[in-house]
């Protein structure tokens, strides 16, 4: 069996899982509801607040799907019960971030401001402290959507390796390059 796929998933208090109905599993919790398509080769069983996944055959593809869908369902359960957060740090002189409605207003050293529209499923906060780099906090129940939005924001100003200026995840280590040495 798949090492990850064979592990049972414990349902926390207040979280319900139903399905698969027409190959879709629904997870509902205090923070919201999520749904996920499940391949017909994978079966989902729910017993005593424990979810287990089984596969029909031992084909290589089915083994991969077994682990994949177990992790996706586990992420859905964590999302609707506690949620996910990602923080981005804006490193650079004059870099600013503010929230205006459902848009993130960014000043990233370009000649123009950047307005990044945030999906309604994601909550965003901009934090500016004097003497520190501005931070953008993203929060949501869908881990995949949250990561995708954070990655898109990060691509608006990629971190350059010489001075380390740009948008990075909070706590991310950047490989720095040495600049050219002056020749005599």
Curated annotation (Swiss-Prot):
NCBIfam families: L6_bact. Pfam families: Ribosomal_L6 (PF00347). The gene is rplF. One of its GO terms (cellular component) is cytosolic large ribosomal subunit. The keyword Cell division does not apply. This is Large ribosomal subunit protein uL6. Belongs to the universal ribosomal protein uL6 family. Part of the 50S ribosomal subunit. Keywords: Ribonucleoprotein, Ribosomal protein, RNA-binding, rRNA-binding. This protein binds to the 23S rRNA, and is important in its secondary structure. It is located near the subunit interface in the base of the L7/L12 stalk, and near the tRNA binding site of the peptidyltransferase center. One of its GO terms (molecular function) is rRNA binding. The keyword RNA-binding applies. It comes from Amoebophilus asiaticus (strain 5a2). GO terms for biological process: cytoplasmic translation.
